[in-house]
Amino acid sequence: LLFIVILIIYIFTANTDVTYTDNGELAAACAMLGIAHPTGYPLFTLLGHLWSLIPFGFSKIYSLNLFAAILTALSSIVLFYTSLMILSNAKFRNKQIIEGSQKRKRHIDISYQNLDLSSFSQIIISLIIALTYGLAQTIWEQANSLEVYSLQLLLMNLVIFFVLKAYFSHSKKYYFITAFCLGLTMSNHLTGILLVPAILWLY
C-alpha cells in the first residue's frame, strides 16, 4: 500500500520529456546501450536498457522517467522495513546509581532494556518515516526524471537494511548479501563508498 501511494504521487509528477542535468544523456545511453560520462554507470545503463525494451506505448524518455519513479518508490519500501527492524530490536540504556556501604563506594549500574513498542506503533512510526523520506524534496526530485541517483537510493537502502540484518541476526548469509549489494552500489555510483566507514564502525 505504501509503495502504491508513493508511486502514484510520483507518476503524477513525473516529467514526460527531457529535463535538466544529465537526464537526456542518460536516457540516450539507456535506450541505445551506450556509455554515459565517467564513470559510465554500467549497472544503471544495463537496467535502464532492459526497461526501455518494454513496449509501453509512449515515449522512451517518459518510460525511463517512470523507471526512476519506481526505483525511488522501492527505496521507500526498503526504508520502511529497515525502520521496522530497528524499532523491533531497539534498546535503551538504563543507568542507575547504587549507593554503597561505608567500605564500598557507590557505583553506576548500566543495563539495557528493550524498547517496548506494540507492533501497531512500530508500523505507524515506520510509515511516517518512509513517507517523510519519500516525499522529501531531494528524494522526490530523483523520482521525477531519469537519474542515476534513483537506483543509488534503492541500493544504498538495501545495503543499510542487510548490514543491520546481519548485525541483529548474526547470520553469515547477510554479511555476504551486504557485500554483494555494496558491490552493486559501487558499480552504479561511487557515492556508495560513503557507506564503508559506517559498516566498518558497526563491526
Regions found by a protein language model. Name each.
Residues 1-20, 133-135, 189:
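Transmembrane signal-anchor helices characteristic of membrane glycosylation enzymes that use polyprenol
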Residues 9, 14, 48, 52, ...:
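Membrane-water interface at transmembrane helix exits
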Residues 13, 54-61, 65, 98-119, ...:
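Aromatic- and kink-enriched transmembrane "portal" helix at the membrane-lumen/periplasm boundary
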Residues 14-26, 36-47:
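Extracytoplasmic catalytic/substrate-binding loops of multi-pass membrane glycan-assembly enzymes
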Residues 120, 143, 156-175, 182, ...:
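Membrane-interface transmembrane helices that cradle and orient dolichyl/undecaprenyl
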Residues 195-203:
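Perimembrane helix-loop-helix junctions
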